């Protein structure tokens, strides 16, 4: 089995230079990089992660807990994290918790056993049980990004959800809609309450009475949107516009409407939230509220890297300003 000395000898450089090229820890001239990487390929050299961790007290790995990586919002956040880790020479271990406390506990134990250098927690369901688990890992540098009230344990995502709800609803109103409904997320979550607050604020400013029958609780998943769509379809008095609290629910809602012969935007207008990658390519292209998901992931991992160097690095607030992206899913009634 080839060693780092064999690579250095073949490339005509020092073992230190080989180490810097492989670990991306210092600038090395491009020509030298090519020689080293060619030697690595020729010799089929693979550095020992165990030896490196013993020598340097680092595994060059980061653990990440997310609710569900198949959710397009989290998928795009993860993309930002993974891209940063790759460029920095780190390996990302991704753990889908599904909001399950047992899985959260087991994953935390596994990541601790693998001696990850840091932990990034970005779940939509951070509750006290999870915070208690994380508090027991206080020796591990971590960034906990939370959408809830400020906590001394967590970094805060300030997503200005009230403004997002207000902007979406006002766009409906500006296009002549008064019969406006909402397909919300988990009503116990602060970000959902804030979006609904923005919805109510825009309606009140316009002097429009809110019909509570048109406000339906979803759970950010497609199945809840299908159920909501069927409820709207069954109504004798339907809204002309529906504000969905994420794009996935908006798309499932539109699909169910179309199958029932209810056309979007001709019969009902729809606005989503998040501006996921698929939104411009849906039929019709979805008007939505943009959130900078990749930048959120990149910022979170940057904060974690700072905390790996200094565990007492101050808690941070990451602010996202919602922006309306106008496409083709809202009909102008003016």
Swiss-Prot record:
Residues annotated for hypoxanthine binding in this entry: 73, 189, 191, 220, 274
Name the pathway it acts in: Purine metabolism; purine nucleotide biosynthesis [regulation]
Query: Which terms in the Gene Ontology molecular function aspect does this entry carry?
Result: DNA-binding transcription factor activity; transcription cis-regulatory region binding
Q: What are the residue boundaries of the HTH lacI-type domain, all occurrences included?
A: 2-56
Q: What is a single Pfam family found in this protein's UniProt entry? A: Peripla_BP_3
What PROSITE patterns does the annotation carry? HTH_LACI_1, HTH_LACI_2
Looking up CDD domains in the UniProt record yields:
HTH_LacI (cd01392), PBP1_PurR (cd06275)
Domain comment, in the record's words? Consists of two structural and functional domains: an N-terminal DNA-binding domain, approximately the first 60 residues, and a larger C-terminal domain, approximately 280 residues, which imparts the function of corepressor binding and oligomerization.
Q: What does the subunit comment say?
A: Homodimer.
Function of the molecule: Is the main repressor of the genes involved in the de novo synthesis of purine nucleotides, regulating purB, purC, purEK, purF, purHD, purL, purMN and guaBA expression. PurR is allosterically activated to bind its cognate DNA by binding the purine corepressors, hypoxanthine or guanine, thereby effecting transcription repression.
Q: What is this protein called?
A: HTH-type transcriptional repressor PurR
Species this protein is from: Photobacterium profundum (strain SS9)
Q: Which gene encodes it?
A: purR
